[in-house]
Design a protein with these regions (language model features):
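Structural signature of Gram-negative outer-membrane beta-barrels, strongest in the C-terminal barrel
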Residues: 260-262, 368, 387-391, 395-399, ...
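Gram-negative outer-membrane beta-barrel transporters
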Residues: 460-461, 578-666, 701, 729-731
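Acidic/polar loop-and-plug regions of large Gram-negative outer-membrane beta-barrel proteins
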Residues: 239-243, 256-325, 336-368, 413-443, ...
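Short acidic/polar hinge/loop motifs at secondary-structure boundaries
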Residues: 119, 130, 146-173, 191-193
């Protein structure tokens, strides 16, 4: 049995459509949600269906085909199958529908669209960016729940994943040590892959956009035998694109395949592979400023590299899962994945000598590997006359990196070519012969852990979520951490059938290899996240909303031991370190996602974060921003509305990204990007039951801004001007 939710009108509550300061629009909308829900029919949650938006009684997490901007459940935080309202942490989900509506194709664009996350275009990393949340860099990305290690400063080894193979992206903000082990108290990003289907489905899309951007995508899934116990799926993409920045030209293609086999009615084996190749001509490291940090108002197309710069990357991934479902409702799952990127790049840099800018060129190659394993069992148990949930498991991951390279003979010397940013010719420098043996680095890290988590229903409205992890960490330099305990505690109280309040305490640790005056390694950095909030769930889960306040204390940070020897024993320069530094982050997050009416999808989020030094060896740092290049305020909004009547078959949408000012200052230069907002528009025409034509307009108002700023000579990445993408989707 199903019911249709009536089209309801929004109560005003003084929500006039006029310019409001940052969060006011989101707050106004959040205040309206209970009233919207009250106007809807009192249909049982297990039976509710909004027109075009499915809400399943089975609490399915899959978003493909749902038409929704939210999902039923997420287990990224605890591996317990909890709804967003039942999870005592801030969770956001970027669904397949929102990815398609916004025309998002890369992980960078996805992070830019998710509440609380900051994306800054990277330096020397191909076309990928660095990610942060709550004032700290993100250093954990998960694939189907299995963690992988990021590079320094939250840059994922130059990999900007193509989203065609993913169903959704789940993000848990704050300390996530229960599932990830080590890392920063920022967030964990879980990339959830598409799965095979038992019924046939196939689609094809072709896109053409600004700056000769061409893209083809094919996706097919079906049962492979009559009994439907063997199922498969294949996704293929090909893209060739230029850029608004001169010289830049990228070509990439990927192939993804996955097979599910029911070995028995209660046992399923999944195996898959993913291959992606990226060939980029040109590597942009941004534009320079004046020596004092003033922007030079260069054309947005300015490219200050050479025409022989390039970035070649190949990514190979294999993965497997074995799941067994017991008769008593428990399940056990064993999963493994191995990802092996290979990078070969040549890129240009700029150094400043007084008022003179000089050009340099570098090359390097890198071979990386990340192997992750996880085994866990989960199910329900009875205690004190109530049903509770439990998960227990163990995980292991190993990461290695071998890189080597060199630089042109003239680099950083007086013979280096002089660069005039106003009159630079990318072809004016001949390709140098670079000796790749000038430097080499290699590293191996391993970490293992055992974990457990439970949700205990102490009373009808009250649940307690408890967990803990014991971790072991080591690297090939001899540094190790043994039996590091990471606690997890949260409480959720249901105010009624739609609203809950919660509070949580979560932790994470981060190894640091610096040594003290006694030549002993410092103890790990600890990250503790305190959080409290309120969550709402409406229309049987078709709409989720949350508001949270948080405080993060990152302690034991290595700082200079000014009372110790200089140089530190065993080193040629610099003080020894002591684990006494502290950074404190405080803030507010608001998040709304899902269906407001049968035809109206919305995702809106506001974030305010203040992260500052509380203890440091340099007294001048106390009270200063931990990283002023991260904006304190962010507003993100995406909406889509399906028209009716004479305009039936049309869907229109818009998006807004706004952020506060950012700064970069080292004493000699001061860069500042003021607050800005960019607007996107999209419209889709359902030609017939199989074909849809969609137009996306990004930066519709053609705002001129710097997407990220870094220094006076590199890292100042200009935001893309207005651009369009036209896509034809066809379902076979």
């Amino acid at each position: 049995m199903s019911h249709a939710l009536n089209f309801v009108s929004l109560p005003s509550h003084h929500c006039a459509l006029r310019p409001l300061a940052q969060a006011a629009a989101v707050l106004c909308l959040a205040a309206s949600l209970p009233a919207i829900a009250q106007q809807a029919p009192a249909t049982p949650a297990a039976e509710q269906t909004m027109l075009g938006v499915s809400v399943t009684a089975g609490r399915d997490a899959t978003t493909e085909g749902s038409g929704s901007y939210t999902t039923g459940v997420s287990n990224t935080a605890t591996k317990l199958n909890l709804s967003l309202r039942e999870t005592p942490q801030s969770v956001s989900v970027l669904t397949r529908q929102q990815i398609d509506d916004l025309g998002i194709t890369t992980l960078d664009d996805a992070v830019q669209s998710i509440t609380g996350l900051v994306m800054q275009k990277g330096n020397f990393t191909g076309d990928s960016g660095s990610f942060s949340a709550r004032g700290f860099p993100i250093d954990n990305i998960l694939f189907d729940g299995l963690p992988t290690s990021l590079g320094a400063n939250g840059t994922f080894n130059g990999d900007n994943d193509d989203l065609a193979i993913y169903d959704r992206i789940e993000v848990v903000r704050g300390a996530t040590g229960l599932m990830t082990g080590s890392g920063t108290p920022s967030a964990a990003i879980n990339m959830v892959r598409k799965r095979p289907t038992a019924t046939p489905q196939a689609s094809f899309s072709a896109s053409v956009g600004s700056w000769s951007n061409y893209r083809l995508e094919a996706d097919a899934a079906n049962a492979l035998n009559e009994a439907k116990t063997l199922r498969g799926r294949v996704v293929v993409t090909v893209q060739d694109k230029k850029d608004f920045v001169d010289v830049l030209h990228g070509r990439n293609h990927q192939l993804y395949g996955i097979i599910e086999a029911d070995l028995r009615p209660d046992t399923t084996l999944t195996v898959g592979a993913h291959y992606r190749k990226t060939d980029n001509d040109g590597v942009s490291t941004g534009v320079v400023t004046a020596a004092d940090g003033r922007f030079l108002n260069l054309p947005r197309s300015t490219y200050l590299g050479s025409d022989f710069d390039d970035w070649r990357q190949t990514d190979k991934t294999i993965f497997a899962e074995l799941e067994h479902r017991f008769a008593n409702g428990w399940k056990a799952k064993l999963a493994a994945t191995r990802k092996t990127p290979e990078i070969d790049t040549t890129f240009s840099g700029i150094n400043r000598r007084g008022d003179t800018l000089r050009f340099n060129s570098q090359s390097y190659r890198a071979e990386l590997a990340n192997t992750s394993y996880d085994a866990y069992a989960s199910g329900s148990y009875s205690l004190f006359g109530r049903e509770h949930e439990l998960t227990v498991g163990a995980s292991h991951r190993r990461s290695s990196k071998n890189s080597y390279g060199g630089w042109a003979p003239y680099s950083w010397g007086a013979a280096a070519p002089v660069l005039d940013p106003f009159n630079w010719d990318a072809g004016s420098v001949a390709r140098p012969v670079i000796n790749y043996a000038q430097w080499r680095t290699a590293s191996i890290t391993e970490q293992s852990g055992v974990y457990a988590g439970t949700r205990m229903r102490l009373a009808d409205p009250l649940s307690l979520v408890l967990g803990g992890r014991v971790s072991w960490y080591k690297d090939d330099a001899g540094y190790s951490v043994a039996r590091e305990f990471t606690p997890y505690a949260g409480v959720v109280y249901d105010l009624d059938k739609q609203h809950s309040v919660y509070a949580s305490w979560t932790e994470i640790f981060q190894p640091q290899a610096a040594t003290d005056a006694h030549a002993q390694p410092l103890k790990p950095i600890s990250g503790t996240n305190y959080e409290a909030g309120v969550k709402g769930e409406y229309f049987g889960g078709a709409l989720n909303a949350s508001a949270a306040v948080f405080q993060i204390r990152q302690q034991n940070r290595g700082v200079d031991d000014l009372a110790g020897p200089n140089p530190c024993p065993g080193s040629t320069w610099g003080y020894c370190q002591r684990a006494s530094g502290e950074v404190r982050s405080e803030g507010v997050e608001l998040d709304v996602a899902g269906a407001l009416t049968p035809d109206w999808q919305l995702s809106a989020g506001f974030t305010y974060v203040k992260a500052q030094f509380k203890r440091d060896s340099d007294p001048a740092n106390i009270g200063k921003d931990f990283n002023s290049r991260y904006p304190r305020q962010q507003l993100k909004l995406a909406t889509s509305y399906r028209l009716s009547g004479a305009a039936q078959g049309w869907r229109v949408g818009a998006s807004v990204y706004g952020q506060g000012a950012t700064e970069s200052n080292d004493g000699t230069y001061h860069l500042r990007q003021g607050r800005y907002a960019i607007v996107g528009l999209n419209a889709a025409w359902q030609i017939d039951s199989r074909a849809e034509l969609r137009l996306n307009v990004n930066n519709a108002l053609d705002k001129h801004y710097y997407q990220s700023i870094y220094s006076d000579v590199f890292g100042n990445m200009v935001g893309a001007p207005r651009n369009l993408m036209l896509t034809l989707n066809y379902k076979l």
